[in-house]
């Protein structure tokens, strides 16, 4: 099955991600996942009987749960998941990196150096 990622959030407290995935038939799910890969808006997931491909490459994506998409549920996640990169994906310096469970920031931000 072919899924297009329409929106994504990361949760620094749990080290997991949430993405809105839409199928060709416009079935939408919110996927809560763990893995070494961050699903950016525009990413494509292909699920076959044997493997999961992310943008055409084999990927290690562990789906924790899939929720039926509703705007209310997605808005609730966006409101309560507190990651500066979710609001500013071009963030360069993050003042919360020391509290984050991600070894590397999914958005590429660095921790501010002590002065």
Question: What are these model-predicted stretches?
Answer:
Residues 33-49:
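Short nucleic-acid-contacting surface segments enriched for D/E, G, S/T with interspersed K/R
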